[in-house]
């Protein structure tokens, strides 16, 4: 997540569009959470 925030900060500086980057982060976090769910399921945590 820290890496994602670093990338986002660079993107905001490049694009100057805060809103687009917030949307990108939201999408990234959703995918990340889905990945965690899959990992937990495969490891038997759920």
Curated annotation (Swiss-Prot):
The keyword Disulfide bond does not apply. It comes from the Eukaryota. Found in many tissues including liver, urine, preputial gland, clitoral gland, submandibular gland and salivary gland. Glycans are attached at residue 15. Belongs to the calycin superfamily. Lipocalin family. This is Major urinary protein. GO terms for molecular function: pheromone binding. Induction: Repressed by estrogen. It is found in: Secreted. GO terms for cellular component: extracellular region. Keywords: Glycoprotein, Pheromone-binding, Secreted, Transport. Its main location: secreted. Binds pheromones that are released from drying urine of males. These pheromones affect the sexual behavior of females. Acts as a shuttle for pheromonal communication between individuals of the same species.
